[in-house]
């Protein structure tokens, strides 16, 4: 199986190519400039790859603009080449990058909130112990038990949430998206491009003036 993966939900823009279990990837930190870099990076990576079987992308949550870029690019390529598309949770991709079996994934959602989930890896898949949510840091639920590792830039912005170990530098990558997408695509979970949608977790992009004064 050969497919491409995209991830543009944070300041990082990354692309990956999966070829029969081998991953090739490119990554660059380009805040607010993903639209300039994503397609050229992907074209550079896949130029000599031959026909792709699918497109995977980081569906969210994350930057609204970044999610639309990844989803739109995945849809455009899928429509053009008749390929299925698969969206992958950016919180799961963050957990995948953390390298631990029990991960609290926490991404800065701005507006004094975080995108947050507690995930446990069983049988090569991530399972939600605490469902993905957009929440104020002080209201984030604590995961049960011990041995949880925190991962994501939400910890850089708001502290360690009481966890013993946090990895604030960890972020979702296209390589992680590819690793998570591979078994799902093999199982036929890819969908028509028209059905691919971002996962926002909230429906507002800015605070009102009243909210800013609080």
Residue ranges with predicted function:
Residues 45, 80, 98, 177-185:
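Stable alpha-helical structural segments in soluble proteins, enriched in small hydrophobic residues
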Residues 1-64, 171:
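N-terminal beta-alpha supersecondary unit
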Residues 62, 77, 150, 178, ...:
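A residue-level signal for conserved active-site and pocket-lining positions in enzyme catalytic cores
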Residues 43, 75, 92-93:
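Active-site phosphate/pyrophosphate- and oxyanion-stabilizing loops and adjacent acidic/basic residues
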Residues 165-214:
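Acyltransferase
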Residues 23, 27-33, 83-173, 200, ...:
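Surface "functional belts" at beta-alpha junctions
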Residues 48-50, 143-145, 185:
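Glycine-rich phosphate-binding loop signature in dinucleotide/nucleotide-binding domains
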Residues 54-85:
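DPxDG-like acidic metal-binding loop motif
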């Amino acid at each position: 199986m050969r497919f491409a993966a995209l991830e543009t939900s944070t300041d990082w823009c990354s692309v990956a190519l999966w070829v029969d279990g081998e991953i090739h990837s490119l990554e660059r930190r380009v805040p607010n400039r993903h639209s300039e870099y994503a397609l050229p990076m992907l074209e550079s990576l896949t130029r000599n790859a031959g026909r792709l079987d699918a497109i995977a992308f980081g569906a969210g949550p994350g930057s609204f603009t970044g999610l639309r870029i990844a989803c739109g690019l995945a849809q455009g390529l899928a429509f053009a080449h008749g390929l299925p598309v698969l969206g992958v949770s950016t919180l799961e991709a963050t957990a995948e990058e953390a390298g631990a079996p029990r991960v609290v994934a926490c991404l800065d959602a701005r507006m004094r909130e975080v995108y947050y989930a507690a995930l446990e890896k069983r049988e090569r898949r991530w399972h939600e112990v605490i469902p993905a949510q957009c929440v104020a840091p002080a209201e984030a639920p604590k995961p049960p038990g011990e041995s949880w590792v925190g991962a994501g830039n939400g910890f850089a912005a708001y502290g360690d949430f009481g966890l013993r170990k946090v990895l604030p530098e960890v972020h979702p990558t296209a390589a992680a998206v590819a690793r998570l997408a591979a078994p799902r695509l093999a199982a036929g979970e890819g969908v028509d491009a028209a059905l691919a949608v971002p996962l926002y977790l909230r429906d507002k992009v800015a605070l009102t003036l009243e909210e800013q004064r609080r």
